[in-house]
Amino acid sequence: MSIDPQTIRQLLLQLGDTVRDKVAQARLAVSSDDESLATISRESVADTIYGIDRISEEAIESWFAEYWPQEIPIELVMEGVEPDKPVTIPHGTPLGQTLYKCILDPIDGTRAIMYDKRSAWFLAGLASQKGADTRLSDIEVAVMVELPTTKQWRADRVAAIRGQGAVVDSVNVLTWEQKPILLRPSRATDALHGFAYISRFFPTGKSIIATIEQELWETLYPSEGGRDSIIFEDQYISTGGQFYEVLTGHDRMIADIRPLVFAKLGLNSALCCHPYDVCSSLILMELGVVVEHPLGGPLNGPLDTTSPISWVAYANEKLAASICP
């Protein structure tokens, strides 16, 4: 059965809008000193689930029940769904009868948005169902929807269909007016006097990652005449947010090598990226950004909630050629 990808794109954007609005309502409903949204709700095999995550999970469950077309049976893979308990839509559909696998990160950037510090992102991708063999490279439609802080009036949305480019717009969350916007990744061919960095959000492995980054920049851009090379960083604790910063031209290169570092240290830590964190990477590629494994080769993990993912995004091909190993 062939499904119009434009229909899928609109459905996933609608779902992202629903999550955005529910999260905004929840933030407005609590006082500034109420930390219930930042309270740990439970621990999953993939991540820590906070109070604010429960709001998005409930919104997603009700949205799928009401709006997802019954003739498009899917397997739903998302943060909070245990690997041994697959969820299908419509509920009760045998896994073998699903046509697609839909992978979601309802709130990518929970730790920032739950303190009203910085935007989080709703991320989604849909791929033809291949069971355990379904991979990131199979994603045909991907969307990102910004979940803004309470002081923001604008929230952006990006959606891509493989081979058809991307559609970008902004939503005025006060009036609901939508306007198309243009995203243009940086055309810079080096990182000097721009934002470029390797992610190191948590204490584990931080010193090693910092050393690797320092050695990278010193190798590429040696100090001359006693003057240090100038490169900025912005540790945006949201993979979707990092992707967006590259898409807008704000950041030139971002890498996340935590799984590689943890493996070197002999650590089994869930504090790293998983496939749902990078499920919108198709959008970057459709807009000319180079997204790949940090050691080279395609970014291509299974569509599950537990596999560790290392990635790097370069704003353009010339920049990638000048930096990648």
Model-derived features: positions:
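N-terminal subdomain of lithium-sensitive/metallo-dependent phosphomonoesterases centered on the IMPase/IPPase/PAP
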Residues: M1-I107, K318-L319, C324
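Short, conserved micro-motifs enriched in small and acidic residues
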Residues: R9, D47-I55, M114-K117, I237-G240, ...
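An extended, acidic
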Residues: L12, G16-V19, V23, R27, ...
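Alpha-helix termini
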Residues: A29-S31, A65-P73, S128-T134, T149-T150, ...
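A short glycine/serine-rich beta->alpha loop
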Residues: S44-I49, D108-A112, S229-E233, S269-A270
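Conserved long hydrophobic alpha-helices within structured protein cores
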Residues: R54-A59, Q70-L76, F122, G241-I257
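Buried hydrophobic packing segments
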Residues: I60, F64, F122, L126, ...
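DPxDG-like acidic metal-binding loop motif
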Residues: L95-G163
